[in-house]
Amino acid sequence: MKTRTINFKNKSSVFWKYFTENTTDTRCMRNTANFYIRNTMTGIRKSPEERTALETEVLHDVFTGIQKANREAEERFLSKLERLVKSGGMKSAVRRSRLVQTVFSYPTKDKWFLNYETLDAIFKETNHPVYRRMNSQVNQNAIRKTVKSWVGYFESMKEYVVCPEKFLGKPKLPGYIRTQQATAWWTKQTARLTFQAGKAYLQFVNLKEMFCIGKESQYRGLKYIKTEIKPFHGQFRILITLDDHMKEPKLPEDPKRILGIDPGLDNLLTVAGNFGKAPFLIRGGVVKSINQRFNKRRAKLIASLTRGYDSSHSHKDSHALDALSRKREDALRDIFYKCAWYLVRYAKVHKVEVIVIGYNPLQKQEISMGKQNNQSFMSIPFQKLREIVRMIANREGIPIVMQDESYTSKASCLDQDPVPDYKKGEVPPEFSGKRTRRGLYRSANGILINADVNGAANIIRKRYPDAFKGQRMDYLYRTTETVNVQDWYLPYRERRNLRKHTCSKISRIRHGDGSERRADLMKAFGCTRKVWTPVKTAA
């Protein structure tokens, strides 16, 4: 699958109104479906006297809608059966034997959950205003998302009862969407992909105008799947999902050329391989600077918005906050894509067979790097970076492996220390080397190696223990190259100081001729509005 992203910010366009209406109605539809499920859950278990007014109203709509839907389903079934009986023949007899009547079951105390088909029938038969004013299938997709969240909640609860240590806490009921808009979803029946005059367009349902999404060559040979309109910090982000018929590359059984990646803070990515090339670091100072500026500016804006109000319940939304968040996400996204393409090109040049990326399952919850480092580390979306690297590497035919990086920074890769998995309650093993100071690791022989390079090599060894077998490892500590993100951008051009500009010879001649011509006109016709003459003042 391939997803193409387009940002849309033209508020004067007809598409802005269309996207706003559909995303707002999607939020209302999802909250309405959630409201019906929650009130059915609580109201069906109570007696009629104990139910609240909302529970009574919801249950009335539920039972009325199911009753009408069953009556219409029975009428359709009987009419089809009558047509098949009249037609006669062997074919109609076979179809008649396979004909099944649709019956919606009423909720009970034990089976109270309303699935997608039941909710759709209830809203349709009761003529719910939100359901009726929305475009076809967009409202149904909103109901599907709500039901899917409830199904995920039930599955999580079953797993939580069996193995609660897998979770950080007890799963909670699906809540309501607090924002004003939610992501709307169009299938290929309600948003068609068309081509005209070398351009690609999306034709949305109930809209005459076509939305241009780029050149025709960008979409030829791809199968269109769906379109999502996502509210994005005061704008809209259009996500077009396409099937590029590409399969995820198979993982080799015994790879010879492996690349290990250790994500970090000061060094955004540390890359080391087992094929004799010097490791390199992609510096993370730019990402830290972006986050630092974002956090400071955001704190000032929120302080100005909540001044004089309770900060925990006040409204924290403004155009400045939207623009600040949007610029930060766009900047990080651009840097992550550049890092990913740099890594993949490096891997293709050196014929890498597999890339191993380290990760910590609970790095956001249980990190302990100090107050300042914790704030910087938690605000960097490392999972998004890993997914971008995976997507681009798979597109180029290089498989990606995620490896738990516990104890990779403590074990010595030069001494071939075993790298175990972390288990709560177990005593950690003793390792040959240790970290002497910031950024350096000393092995048992006294050799100093970059600490992040040592971690990247151990990530490879943890996945493939024999990756460095029979190889000299001196290339890991002899030279460590550094890559700065700033080098991937064009240099800043200073503005020319216009005050230092001197006229050329031709300009002076041209202006001189003009002044002489104006003087001749003044002699011939006298003073005019277009000719300046000094005002004589009395002595």
Positions of the model-derived regions?
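Long, compositionally biased intrinsically disordered regions
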Residues: 1-135, 306-318, 437, 476-477, ...
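Generic detection of short hydrophobic beta-strand segments and adjacent strand-loop junctions
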Residues: 4-10, 209-215, 280-282
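Short amphipathic alpha-helical segments
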Residues: 18, 22-25, 134, 138-145, ...
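Short amphipathic alpha-helical coiled-coil/interface segments
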Residues: 26, 142-150, 321-328
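A generic secondary-structure signal for well-formed alpha-helical elements
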Residues: 30-37, 41, 150-157, 267, ...
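Stable alpha-helical structural segments in soluble proteins, enriched in small hydrophobic residues
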Residues: 33, 141-153, 453-463
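Acidic carboxylate diad motif detector
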Residues: 59-232, 375, 379
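Positively charged, helix-rich recognition surfaces that bind polyanionic ligands
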Residues: 234-539
